[in-house]
Amino acid sequence: MKNIIFPKTLKKGDQIAIISPAGFVEEASLQSTINLIKSKGYQPILGKYTLGKFENGYNYSGTEKERIQDVNWAFNNPEISAIWASRGGYGCQHLLRHLKLSEFRENPKWYIGYSDNTVIQSY
């Protein structure tokens, strides 16, 4: 049986990446999340495509390539201590085959998300 490796406890000043691996999110809707993160003493860092929009029968936050770029950036950036998914929706399952987790497995971090994001959490 493998040992479970838990992420480090967050401390004030840590950076939390905010990404949108599924649905599109309005900037105004994200402001309360940004304010909460700041109020706890953390630094919110938005992914390049967090506020993007790509319509393809569903309002994604970006193309599959753009969304996976943000996810892999957040997972593998050593300066990021936690990842906050801006919303659920649809589309995370399409990203699984593109996840690059080698660095993440050596330095795990908290992944905060619900709905469609649980497929990434369980991967």
What positions do the PLM features span?
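Active-site histidine-anchored catalytic micro-motif
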Residues: 59-123
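ATP/NTP phosphate-donor binding region
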Residues: 1-79
